[in-house]
Amino acid sequence: MKAYELSIEEAAAKLRAGDISSVELTQSCLQRIGDVEDRVKGFITVDEEGALAQAKAADKALQNGETNPLCGIPMSIKDLLAVKDLPMTCGSKMLEKFIAPYNATIVDKLQGAGAVNLGKVTMDEFAMGSTSETCAFGVPQNPWKEGYVAGGSSGGSAVTVAAQECFFSIGTDTGGSIRQPAALCGVVGMKPTYGRVSRYGLTAFASSLDQAGPLCRTVADTALVMNSICGYDPMDSTSINQEVPDYTASLVEGVKGLRIGIPKEYFAKGLDSEVEKVVRNAIAVLASAGAEIVDVSLPHTEYCVAVYYLIAPAEASTNLSRYDGALYGYRDLESKTLEDMYKDTRSAGFGDEVKKRILIGTYALSSGYYDAYYKKASQVRTLIIEDFKNAYRSCDVLLSPVTPTPAWKLGAKSDDPLAIYLSDIMTVSANLAGIPGMSVPGGFTEDGLPVGIQLQGSHFQEEILLKVAYNLEKLLAIQPGKLDF
């Protein structure tokens, strides 16, 4: 087994035992990046010099008795989180030459733990997309099948983990942007409760929906990363001051007696038969292990996509108004007047999908339409939150598909944006409600494409989600397909 193939748990044990150094782990990942990056296109920026310097520092820390399991472990970071002195493009021409002047809090936490940052990874432009095809600096490809989407917007995070270029990655989830690519690429992805992980230093798409979280190869690895990134941050006004448990402590507990809710609305027309087969198998496996299977209803599911695609663009239109060429980022130098500079800068700096969402959001917030669109969407959002509260009165965890289909060919839905938006139907609700959700690998289709199982819990119940996911991982005992590179 090559060093880059290890799990975080395995690599951490070898580091503590002195069987391998962080420099050797990092060199192994850098070599892997050099070998496969042309195929998967996961990175925007690879910081080889910085990574090796961090690895040397981690080796010294380990020699001095550092026990954090992330010390010396190579990672990647989605390119909308600030890493001091590295580019932060957000996948957009608008920020092509922007260098972050400070670290995001989550980056500080991980660097404090001794993790080694290999670089910044591809993403949909300003996180607006479900396939990562809107990235201005290369489109990531699914490691399991060349020419297929990796999911989005954290496509680069999922790809770099699945292709074994790094041990874990930090992505963000606004409407499924961690869970969907995790499902399509066959890795574990966790969207924590809103406010559980600091958003300071995270470039905002939709401020009431965005949340950072980890993508890893195993559930145990995910728990280890969660231990390091969660917690209150006074620099983030949305951060919630609540004690963080040890997420690894209860993983090995069984699921006997746990109530697993199956939302009937997530098994409706349009669900791919192979996806349903994998999910139904997961339900049966949990039942055989002693979990109680409960049918539940989330009656406002049919409105979730419409609500999300009003609220998210509305917040985006406000957040992205700052990108006008005046202070930082791309500036059109041919403009004759200030007004022309604003117009020309934004026209050239933003891609089509971002401009589309800004237009939708501006319209929804405009005078005469606010009550009809944004206000009404916010009212239905409250009903969606109540749906989850009612469901959790009769169950502990909700289990469902992550996406209605497995990955599809790159470009196959480019002319049908509604089809792409509808692929978010099972994930946007967790963001609207602020609850935690995760994707855990459930199996493969006959074509060898991964299928994810979605678990959702009530606020701050990540511990239960991880326990169910860990048990699923062990019970399913999936024999992963072999990457062809």
Curated annotation (Swiss-Prot):
Subunit structure and binding partners: Heterotrimer of A, B and C subunits.
Q: What is its EC number?
A: 6.3.5.7
Against PANTHER family, the record matches this protein to:
GLUTAMYL-TRNA(GLN) AMIDOTRANSFERASE SUBUNIT A, TRANSAMIDASE
According to its UniProt record, which protein family does this protein belong to?
Belongs to the amidase family. GatA subfamily.
| Role description | Allows the formation of correctly charged Gln-tRNA(Gln) through the transamidation of misacylated Glu-tRNA(Gln) in organisms which lack glutaminyl-tRNA synthetase. The reaction takes place in the presence of glutamine and ATP through an activated gamma-phospho-Glu-tRNA(Gln).
Q: Which NCBIfam families match?
A: gatA
Descriptive protein name: Glutamyl-tRNA(Gln) amidotransferase subunit A
Q: Which Pfam families match?
A: Amidase
Which organism does this record belong to?
Desulfotalea psychrophila (strain LSv54 / DSM 12343)
